């Protein structure tokens, strides 16, 4: 390569062709992309001289093209205006991979003409420079055309400049040799903006041809590029440019500053009829080309300009120049969105310095050539001196080569050391991060251990308190039995059946010496005496006016007992509440339309005949129905007696108070609701389900009454008709909070309460009225079903949020006639919602619900409730297709051990809750300023695992039973869960647990094949309104009024702020293009953000990305109202609705890599509010847009606008919701949704179906989802309908009116947001599951 003659260099390289390039050439960096491979800057190893190396994979498909390119280069590159071909090499690859072909060509260090123009002030070259470059291009083309070769890709990027301002043509990848007989080509290859009209016509018309004069057109476009900085139509999408070039008149220079010779030259080159276009020989004689200053003068001027532009480019860019091919690459494989395609390689600055050094060596080499010529002349005069000189030169070259090798080795050694240092630094950072992670894990484990230890201590403390309570209750039971015996003997109202063989558990009677009694017994008697004084008839007749009772101090002479030894901080401190917050929860009247009990009325207000609704227990005597024991509800409500239990007499007072309902008074019925009549969901529970487990009960000891009944049953003696109702205690708070515990020693029998012979109120009404009914029950013992009336347990799969041992037992009402199913599409959503089943804290109201007022505040010493009860109303499936609406009732009870095990499961982070929010160990501040004891118990749903699976009870699901028949593998899902009013509270520890939140974004669904849609929500509250969202991988980008955030669904649910103080109205993620398309900012501009830039704002792992601008605008549009990304085959269109126009953009792949203008439609008759694009039958493009008047269409080719559908029956303006193109209609038919209607029309405005889709209410959002269905979000319900028929497939009723907004959907997940009145928002998502709700 040391020989300057190109032919001899080519021969030398050709002799060693197909050798491995190792040791001969090495690659430095990527400088561009050719047609069939990447172009590198390379270096000759021995001399250090630079070369351009094109690296191509040798495949069978491209073998012919590569051979053609090699032949072209070998034959026709020996011209001063064509880059010289040096040779070819084959780099072997491992087996299974393609070998690499290296084509080595002359390196042009000054870059391309396009680079030169971009680095010139004003993006325009001087006319003299343009004339010189055009002349050199014409000379190169004349050489090619003389050999019947068409270049076919003349443009600024393929015209390179050397250091000495020589002009070289490159990229023969699309060159073709003309056939000797035909002389014309009909293939379609080239770059759109520089392409001649006859070449474009070849794609549209197979009979069209062109010849070498197509290069003349490209030369004229390149001249305009040098004069104006860019070719004509460069802002248009390449496809649009291909359409316009043959149809538009030839382009002209915009400015008038250019000379007439230059203007005439361009007009001559850009003659549309190629047969009239002059050949290269004639153009070389054109005045603009011929009448030029001397070549030396122009080259000096151009060389100075190149040097200046290189300095500027060195400051701005990191590469010397860029080769670029004419390919349009596929953008489906994660392209980077940054405009530069230059790779960053280690040691880049070192390479740049080395490049400058090598360029200086090139200059010295040129001087050495002159010296060599002088030496040749001396050789003829003095041969001997010449030989000596040659030896000297040889020795010097050897020394220089050694020095060069030493420098290269030193440089490689420094690079290796630098890499090692970097690797060590990375390893050290990784070790530090791992150490920090381990330390954090250790601290977390310690915190968890400390938490568990404290929890166990408090549990032990609660167990001690429970043992004390057992002792107290045992003593109180004995006192009660004695009082009952005395009163029965005095009044003689009932038969004197005294249990002679029954002994009380404790025998501290009144005859015993008080000194012999223990301290706690004397204390209890003292309290009983004082409470008995308060139980006078006067006090009973005014329960609502009774104020809080001051605490009774213990007797001073009494020695400290077990109660007094309890630490003060561990004793329950309950606030005294007013009369309107009664301390006693009330019985759920399971009798049809039983009267709701006021909150201020105690349990004994209801006569015992209310129990007639329950079937008889296992006792053979059906008249003897034992009074139920105190059974708290599933929400932990504990029914406590506020007075001393010894004051409870055996029968009612002879003069009952006026507020006790007479026995003959008919109970008032619950008013029938006339709206929100919900149809029931029935599915079978046969296949794939596991056997139902019995509801567990852990009785510790029987109560005295139960012992008496059992012994009488064993002896066969008759039993009394039942204990009479007990007189009520005062409604105020007891003086001793420790006495407010239900007796843990009494029997807790788990039983199923069947429905009565009437009709229960509907599930939705019961759910909404649960606070008025007072769902917390107080039962002395749960009635046990007789063998004939026992409900059959039904198999079911365990659901999230329901422990595995909880089973729903359903009872069909035998006397009830089956009702026909009510069509779901006829539902009414206009009912007034009184109460919400969600906790008020989550609803943001800041006030406890009425159910929570039934208890005197929360406890701080642990939950010692004997039993927790959950009442669930469900429907029964009947054989055939006729469902029964008789209500079945399940009473689920839990013992304290179960409560503690469930609490431990929650606190240990088990993912058994159906909501995505799990309890956390890190306490946070109380929301809404509530104190911990008065937090509403809606959160206990979550902390106790009682969250309703579909939507945490904030949505109730209904479907049309006529549509979905019961499947063989589905489980029966309860329509709603009626959980008793908030009685007791969890202890302070559990409250702290559920204050924080750890988001489990991929909760494990324990149901094997769930076919029921579920609604869940994320705990995170956004302070501003959520306007839009888009899925980025599995994570969710959320756009609000105040910025852009990322919700990490793959991790712990953390929210990362990406962009602040900017409004985001609409967004879409195009991951394959590395883009996020948005309408954002105050002016509603269409901005495109690079995902790699957003990713770096979270990871901060690429400093180079941080320096770049992370977004760009599409055009200069402001006031964008809506856009739509439409993918057709491999083309991505972007349709944008502006104030009075619609713009159509299309994605242009590399080298453009941006959305470019395709078509514009201005001055539309209606302002577009909603826009979409369709391709009719794969041929015709039409823009469909909705306005306040109706729906309209614009033909893209002709620009004609016409109306599609105008709802003339609506006089006012309408709100268009969605344009849905029906599947399998070739883009011709669509569903247009507006207001609360939807019509089926085709793109020509013809009604295709005499069906009008009618929503149940005015939706705020309408969206088409993957399951070929359409969803509407209203304030009262979410409706799901078939997109092809408009038939209602399902409804999710809200528990309260709220504004919902569709965000995005993918596969079987639909994301939407709820917006509160204060502007705060939360994200919900609905999982449609595998079958997309088609198998409900």
Curated annotation (Swiss-Prot):
Localization recorded for this chain is: Cytoplasm; Postsynaptic density; Cell projection, Axon; Cell projection, Dendrite
- Which reactions does this protein catalyse? L-seryl-[protein] + ATP = O-phospho-L-seryl-[protein] + ADP + H(+); L-threonyl-[protein] + ATP = O-phospho-L-threonyl-[protein] + ADP + H(+)
Q: How does it assemble?
A: Interacts with RAP2A and NCK1. Interacts with TANC1.
- Which residues participate in ATP binding? 31-39, 54
Biased segments, Basic and acidic residues type: 396-466, 519-529, 738-750, 808-825
Active site annotated at which positions?
A: 153
* Cellular component, GO annotation: axon; cytoplasm; dendrite; glutamatergic synapse; Golgi apparatus; postsynapse; postsynaptic density
Specify residue ranges for compositional bias: Pro residues.
548-562, 718-731
Positions of the UniProt region annotated as Mediates interaction with RAP2A: 870-1336
The protein here is known as: Misshapen-like kinase 1
Q: What does this protein do?
A: Serine/threonine kinase which acts as a negative regulator of Ras-related Rap2-mediated signal transduction to control neuronal structure and AMPA receptor trafficking. Required for normal synaptic density, dendrite complexity, as well as surface AMPA receptor expression in hippocampal neurons. Can activate the JNK and MAPK14/p38 pathways and mediates stimulation of the stress-activated protein kinase MAPK14/p38 MAPK downstream of the Raf/ERK pathway. Phosphorylates TANC1 upon stimulation by RAP2A, MBP and SMAD1.
Q: Disordered: where is this region?
A: 299-347, 363-383, 395-890, 909-946
Q: Which CDD domains match?
A: STKc_MAP4K4_6_N
Please list the residues that carry the modification Phosphothreonine. 895
Q: Which GO terms describe its biological process?
A: actin cytoskeleton organization; brain development; chemical synaptic transmission; dendrite morphogenesis; MAPK cascade; negative thymic T cell selection; neuron cellular homeostasis; neuron projection morphogenesis
Q: Which domain of life is it from?
A: Eukaryota
**Which portions of the chain have biased composition (kind: Low complexity)?**
371-380, 479-496, 622-632
Where the record annotates domain CNH, the positions are 1023-1310
């Amino acid at each position: 390569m040391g020989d300057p003659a190109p032919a001899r260099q080519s021969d030398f390289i050709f002799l060693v062709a197909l050798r491995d390039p190792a040791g001969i050439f090495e690659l430095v960096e990527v400088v561009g992309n050719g047609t069939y491979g990447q172009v590198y800057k390379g270096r000759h190893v021995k001399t250090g001289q630079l070369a351009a190396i094109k690296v191509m994979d040798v495949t069978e498909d491209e073998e012919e093209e590569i051979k053609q390119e090699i032949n072209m280069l070998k034959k026709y590159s020996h011209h001063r205006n064509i880059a010289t071909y040096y040779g070819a090499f084959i780099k072997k690859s491992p087996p299974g991979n393609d070998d690499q072909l290296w084509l080595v060509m002359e390196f042009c260090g000054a870059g391309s003409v396009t680079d030169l123009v971009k680095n010139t002030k004003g993006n325009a070259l001087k006319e003299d420079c343009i004339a010189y470059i055009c002349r050199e291009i014409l000379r190169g083309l004349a050489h090619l055309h003389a050999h019947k070769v068409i270049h076919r890709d003349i443009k600024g990027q393929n015209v390179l400049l050397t250091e000495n301002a020589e002009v070289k043509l490159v990229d023969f990848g699309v060159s073709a040799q003309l056939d000797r007989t035909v002389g014309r080509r009909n293939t379609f290859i080239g770059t759109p903006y520089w392409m001649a009209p006859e070449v474009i016509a070849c794609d549209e018309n197979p009979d069209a041809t062109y010849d070498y004069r197509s290069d003349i057109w490209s030369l004229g476009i390149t001249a305009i590029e040098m004069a104006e900085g860019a070719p004509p139509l460069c802002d248009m999408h390449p496809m649009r440019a291909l359409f316009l070039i043959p149809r538009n008149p030839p382009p002209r220079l915009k400015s008038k500053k250019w000379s007439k010779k230059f203007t005439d030259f361009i007009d001559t080159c850009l003659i549309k009829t190629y047969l009239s276009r002059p050949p290269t020989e004639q153009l070389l004689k054109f005045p603009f080309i011929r009448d030029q200053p001397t070549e030396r003068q122009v080259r000096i001027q151009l060389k100075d300009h190149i040097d200046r532009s290189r300095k500027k480019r060195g400051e701005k860019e990191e590469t010397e120049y860029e080769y670029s091919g004419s390919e349009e690459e596929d953008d489906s494989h994660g392209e980077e969105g940054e405009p530069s395609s230059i790779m960053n390689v280690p040691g880049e600055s070192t390479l740049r310095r080395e490049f400058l050094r090598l360029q200086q060596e090139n200059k010295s080499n040129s001087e050495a050539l002159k010296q060599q010529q002088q030496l040749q002349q001396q050789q003829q005069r003095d041969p001997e001196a010449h030989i000596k000189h040659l030896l000297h030169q040889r020795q010097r070259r050897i020394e220089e080569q050694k020095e060069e090798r030493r420098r290269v080795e030193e440089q490689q050694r420094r690079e290796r050391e630098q890499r090692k240092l970097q690797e060590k630094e990375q390893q050290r950072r990784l070790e530090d991060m791992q150490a920090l992670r381990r330390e954090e894990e250790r601290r977390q484990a310690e915190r968890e251990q400390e938490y568990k230890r404290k929890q166990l201590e408090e549990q032990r403390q609660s167990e001690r308190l429970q043992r004390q309570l057992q002792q107290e209750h045992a003593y109180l039971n004995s006192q009660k039995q004695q009082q009952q015996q005395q009163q029965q003997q005095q009044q003689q109202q009932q038969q004197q059946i005294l249990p002679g063989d029954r002994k009380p558990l404790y025998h501290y009677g009144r005859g015993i010496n008080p000194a012999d009694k223990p301290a706690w017994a004397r204390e209890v008697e003292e309290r009983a005496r004082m409470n008995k004084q308060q139980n006078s008839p006067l006090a009973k007749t005014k329960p609502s006016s009774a104020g809080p009772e001051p605490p009774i101090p213990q007797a001073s002479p009494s020695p400290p007992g077990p109660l007094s030894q309890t630490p003060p901080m561990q004793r329950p401190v309950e606030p005294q509440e007013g009369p309107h917050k009664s301390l006693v929860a009330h019985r759920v009247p399971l009798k049809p339309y039983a009267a709701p009990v006021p909150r201020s009325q105690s349990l004994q207000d209801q006569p015992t005949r209310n129990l007639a609704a329950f079937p008889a227990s296992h006792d053979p005597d059906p008249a003897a129905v034992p009074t139920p024991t105190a059974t708290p509800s599933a929400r932990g409500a504990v029914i406590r007696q506020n007075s001393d239990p010894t004051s409870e007499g055996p029968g009612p007072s002879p003069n009952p108070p006026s507020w006790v309902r007479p026995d003959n008074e008919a109970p008032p019925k619950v008013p029938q609701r006339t709206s929100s009549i919900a149809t029931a969901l029935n599915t079978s529970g046969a296949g794939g389900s596991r056997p139902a487990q019995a509801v567990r009960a852990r009785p510790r000891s029987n109560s005295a009454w139960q012992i008496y009944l059992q012994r009488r049953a064993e002896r066969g003696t008759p039993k009394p008709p039942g204990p009479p109702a007990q007189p009520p205690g005062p409604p105020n708070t007891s003086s001793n909070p420790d006495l407010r515990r239900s007796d843990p020693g009494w029997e807790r029998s788990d039983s199923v309460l069947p429905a009565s012979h009437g009709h229960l109120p509907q599930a939705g009404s019961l759910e909404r009225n649960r606070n008025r009914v007072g769902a917390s029950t107080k039962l002395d013992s749960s009635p046990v079903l007789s063998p004939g009336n026992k409900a059959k347990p039904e198999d079911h799969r365990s659901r999230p949020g329901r422990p595995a041992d909880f089973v729903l037992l359903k009872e069909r009402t035998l006397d009830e006639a089956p009702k026909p199913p009510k069509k779901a599409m006829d539902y009414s959503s206009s009912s007034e919602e009184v109460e919400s089943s969600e906790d008020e804290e989550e609803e943001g109201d800041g006030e406890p619900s009425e159910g929570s007022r039934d208890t005197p505040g929360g406890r701080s010493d642990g939950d010692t409730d004997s039993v927790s009860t959950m009442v669930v109303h469900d429907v029964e499936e009947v054989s055939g297709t006729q469902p029964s609406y008789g209500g079945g009732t399940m009473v689920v009870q839990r013992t304290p051990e179960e409560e503690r095990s469930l609490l431990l499961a929650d606190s240990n982070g088990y993912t058994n809750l159906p909501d995505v929010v799990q309890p956390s160990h890190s306490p946070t501040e109380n929301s809404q300023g509530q104190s911990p004891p008065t937090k509403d118990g809606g959160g206990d749903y979550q902390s106790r695992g009682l969250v309703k699976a579909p939507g945490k009870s904030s949505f109730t699901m209904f479907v049309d039973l006529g549509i979905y028949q019961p499947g063989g593998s589905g489980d029966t899902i309860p329509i709603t869960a009626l959980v008793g009013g908030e009685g007791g509270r969890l202890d302070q520890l559990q409250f702290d647990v559920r204050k924080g939140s750890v988001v489990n974004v991929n909760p494990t669904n324990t149901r094997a094949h769930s076919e029921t849609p579920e609604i869940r929500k994320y705990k995170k509250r956004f302070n501003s309104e959520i306007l839009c969202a888009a899925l980025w991988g599995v994570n969710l980008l959320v756009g609000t009024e105040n910025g852009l955030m990322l919700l990490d669904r793959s991790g712990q649910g953390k929210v990362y702020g990406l962009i602040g103080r900017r409004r985001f109205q609409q967004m879409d993620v195009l991951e394959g293009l590395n883009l996020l398309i948005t309408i954002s900012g105050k002016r509603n501009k269409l901005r495109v953000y690079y995902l790699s830039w957003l990713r770096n704002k979270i990871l901060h792992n690429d400093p180079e990305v941080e320096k770049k601008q992370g977004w760009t605008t599409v055009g200069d549009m402001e006031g964008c109202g809506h856009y739509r990304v439409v993918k057709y085959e491999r083309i991505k269109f972007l349709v944008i609705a502006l104030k009075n126009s619609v713009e159509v953009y299309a994605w242009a792949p590399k080298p453009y890599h941006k959305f470019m203008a395709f078509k514009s439609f201005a001055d539309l008759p209606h302002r577009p509010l909603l826009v979409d694009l369709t391709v009719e039958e794969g041929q015709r493009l039409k823009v469909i847009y909705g306005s306040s008047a109706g729906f309209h269409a614009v033909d893209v080719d002709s620009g004609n606008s016409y109306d599609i559908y105008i709802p003339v029956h609506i006089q006012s303006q309408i709100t268009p919701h969605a344009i849905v193109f029906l599947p399998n209609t070739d883009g011709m038919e669509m569903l247009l949704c507006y207001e609360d209607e939807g019509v089926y029309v085709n793109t020509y405005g013809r009604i295709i179906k005499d069906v009008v889709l009618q929503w149940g209410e005015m939706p705020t959002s309408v969206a088409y989802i993957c399951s070929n269905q359409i969803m509407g979000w209203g304030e009262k319900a979410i409706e799901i309908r078939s997109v092809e028929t408009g038939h209602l497939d399902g409804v999710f009723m809200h528990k309260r009116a709220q504004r919902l907004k569709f965000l995005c959907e993918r596969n079987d997940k639909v994301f939407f947001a709820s917006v509160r009145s204060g502007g705060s928002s939360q994200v919900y998502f609905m999982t449609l599951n595998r079958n997309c709700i088609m198998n409900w």
